Amino acid sequence: MARVAVVVKVYPDDVSIDPKTLAERIKSKLPSGYEVLAEGEEPIAFGLKALKLVIAMNEDTEGGTEEVEQLLKNIEGVQEVEVENVSRMQ
């Protein structure tokens, strides 16, 4: 089964939320079939940092990235999720 790498930008709901803590919370909440391959931070404004993640998932997931977006949005501390890129993994 083919897998895709989804690059997402996760915006925390408060400047006091540590991106590393948020990344660990996300990793612990993702169900099987999803895997965080890479993580980083991107400064936004006024001390707010977005969390950038590369998440591997099955290519044939019904609804495409909608499921992972909803999973992330339902995690405590997440305000918004933006999919930046989706590419097939080899």
Curated annotation (Swiss-Prot):
Keyword check for Ligase: no
Family matches, as SUPFAM superfamilies: eEF-1beta-like
Protein name: Elongation factor 1-beta
Taxonomic lineage: Archaea, Thermoproteota, Thermoprotei, Desulfurococcales, Desulfurococcaceae
NCBIfam families named in the record: aEF-1_beta (TIGR00489), PRK00435.1 (NF001670)
Annotated gene: ef1b
Disulfide bonds, paired cysteine numbers: none
Protein family: Belongs to the EF-1-beta/EF-1-delta family.
Physiological role: Promotes the exchange of GDP for GTP in EF-1-alpha/GDP, thus allowing the regeneration of EF-1-alpha/GTP that could then be used to form the ternary complex EF-1-alpha/GTP/AAtRNA.
InterPro entries on file: eEF-1beta-like_sf (IPR036219), EF1B_bsu/dsu_GNE (IPR014038), Transl_elong_EF1B/ribsomal_bS6 (IPR014717), Transl_elong_EF1B_B_arc (IPR004542)
Protein biosynthesis in keyword set: yes
GO molecular function: translation elongation factor activity
Keywords carried by this UniProt record: Elongation factor, Protein biosynthesis
